[in-house]
Design a protein with these regions (language model features):
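Catalytic loop of the DD-peptidase/beta-lactamase superfamily, centered on the K-T-G motif
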Residues: 1-111
């Protein structure tokens, strides 16, 4: 939180993190989309396809952005990560691999 104050109440956090996409499948990866209110939920073993590391907890949530930006919070570990670049990587494969590697390393350090 900010200056020791909560940013979101427990009820708000629970509501925002509720998966609302049902059985919607991500068209690119053919995995459950796990979409909540403006964020993605790490969830099951397909979390790396959603921009999270392979070692984030299922409770982690966040969103990736254009060109390789990513941001997530993992309530289980207390870790949050924001990765910003000054460029736009147009190689989707490299961009995805880098995001998963950075997220996995960060989660491993917290674990």
């Amino acid at each position: 939180g900010l200056d020791g104050q909560e940013l979101w109440s427990a009820n708000t956090l629970e509501d925002v993190r509720r998966i609302r996409s049902g059985d919607l499948t991500d068209m690119m990866f053919r995995k459950p989309a796990n979409r909540a209110l403006g964020i993605l939920i790490s969830g099951d073993d397909s979390r790396s396809f959603r921009g999270f590391g392979k070692t984030n907890s299922p409770e982690a949530f966040g969103h990736n952005g254009a060109g390789g930006q990513l941001c997530w919070v993992d309530p289980a570990s207390g870790l949050s990560l924001c990765y910003l670049t000054s460029g736009h990587d147009r190689n989707d494969v490299r961009q995805g691999r880098r995001g998963v590697a950075i997220s996995s390393m960060a989660a491993d350090c917290a674990g």
